[in-house]
Amino acid sequence: MVDHVSENSTNVLSAKRKLTEPSLIDSKRVFPCDQCAKRFTRHENLTRHKACHSKAEPIPCPYCEIKCKRKDLLKRHIQRFHNDKSVIEEGSKDVLDVKAAASQQEDNMKIVLPSFDAIDVPKAYHPSLRPYFTILPLIPSDFLEHYIEGYFEWFHPVFPFIHQASFNSENVAASFLRSLVVIACLCTGIESDFSMALLFWDSGFHVLQLYLQGDPERVKKAWVFQSRLLFCTASLFEKTACFSGIGHVLLKDLVHESRTFGWTKLNWSVEGDTDISNLIDLECIRRSVFCLYILEWFLALIFNKPPSLSVLELQMPLPISSALWSSKELLSKDYWRPNPLNPRDALSILVNGPLLLEETNISGFVLLFAIFEFIRDEAKLSMIGLPRQPNRSYEIMLQHLKVSMELSNPCAKTSSIFLCLWHLVLTYYYLPDPLFLRSITLTDLESATSYFKDDSWMDDDYISPCMTTYNLTMGWENVIWGLRYAETELTKFKFDLPVPHLTLFRIFLQGLYALRDFDQISTSSLQTFTMLWKKLSTSLNMKEDAQNTAPSTCVKEFSAFVASALDVEGGWGIGPLLTKAFRPT
């Protein structure tokens, strides 16, 4: 174990040293922008780019409501979308007249149009895109950049399947750009941004669908897969049933395509003529497939949605080193190398001890959900009447994985989210899942808590497993951890992913169901748990009579404390839904 950690540590440190070598800087991009540090291969490209920093008023199109920062872009727009009109010559009176008229128009910035020069926007007018070109007003590029920056600040650090160093918002597909903006809008938790997200989603998704109709092979492009994964994620956690349904259809399609295209076994090599851009695309796809697995099993963990992808299908190396992937310079392919571990190899090591992960974000979550996959499969035994045989190997692997993440030093955001998910998976190991026979949805969370609101303790949808095969005391240690975490840390996740909120919701739900089945625990565990209950009720300032009452009679009182703990604003507006679900009627 020690040798393995030491070897990986040496490799990571070596890679970090190589990143700082001057020879790795892309010598072809010799023209840097003095305002944003972007680099260009040709001076004329730099000159055109500098127009983006200009404070001059954009020039409006005389035939629609599009505005362009440069005259050459306006000419190109007119040629593509108004080809029956004459092209406006530079400096003509028409341009001046239109500019004067445009200054009198109301500046509505609530809708964003597709990028007219993007690869996925039709070169000729298409009727289905008419609202995005003629009816809705244009949002300025600097406003768009605000949300792009938000994406890379809030979402990307946890799920880095986009190569940020090669990402340039000025030359990517319009639909790809909008998929990032949708996620950023949802992360803020601001109601006006939610409305904006739906409009971004609508425009971006329609452009992408039209682009894919033109050539079925386009679905294999890395940016297309990434865009659809982001649109899927946004839909699954949107608070309307319509978008959620679209998200599940997209998820099913993405899983099917990953298998059909062989992406669950995708590998790459630096040998041969493969250039760096191809390597980046292959690594993007591979990381996206891993994130697809994470998404499926997160839905299983929180909502009991039956997953279809298994970790045993992911027969490819884990993502490459974080140091290489996050480098701000495009490296030569000579410095790229595959991760030596695949998920199964890493899991085998975790049985015996921790390991140093070259990449913590995606790898850590994949391994965590893989262990949960094994725990969940074992729990299926109770569905056919077989006794559950707790496997301590899973508990040991979880402990070793936690140490591995600490050794690998992930970013603070990843550490917090991983810790929440880790405690929930451990809770599943110690406590039964009474919702195993059913799924819940984000729009109907109250259905999972209705039993303690109307005193309907018996329900065919819920199972009441034999508690003697579980450890109620250890399970409740995780519930107590969740309450303390919610009190001290949850308020920090205001502009962020809703993972901690949903994870704590599920931990508390498991705890409440365990209280219902409290009377089933063995006598030897009863005394220990009673002491734990008194400790908890005292720390929560519960009434004295509640502290001395059997936990199974205090479900409603405890749920009120849970509702209060979750009553914080957060990304995606999840907090109020969770609070409402737990608040007793």
From Swiss-Prot:
Name of the protein this chain belongs to: Zinc finger protein C11D3.17
Alphabetized InterPro entries for the sequence: Transcription_factor_dom_fun (IPR007219), VerF-like (IPR051059), Znf_C2H2_sf (IPR036236), Znf_C2H2_type (IPR013087)
MF GO annotations: DNA-binding transcription factor activity, RNA polymerase II-specific; RNA polymerase II cis-regulatory region sequence-specific DNA binding; zinc ion binding
Disulphide-bonded residues: none
Keyword vocabulary terms for this entry: DNA-binding, Metal-binding, Nucleus, Phosphoprotein, Repeat, Zinc, Zinc-finger
Alphabetical list of SMART domains matching this protein: ZnF_C2H2
Keyword Metal-binding on entry: yes
Localization per Swiss-Prot or TrEMBL: Nucleus
Species, as recorded: Schizosaccharomyces pombe (strain 972 / ATCC 24843)
Modified sites of kind Phosphothreonine: 553
Major place of residence: nucleus
Zinc finger C2H2-type: from-to: 31-53, 59-82
One GO term (biological process): regulation of transcription by RNA polymerase II
GO cellular component annotations of the record: chromatin; nucleus
One Pfam family matching this protein: Fungal_trans
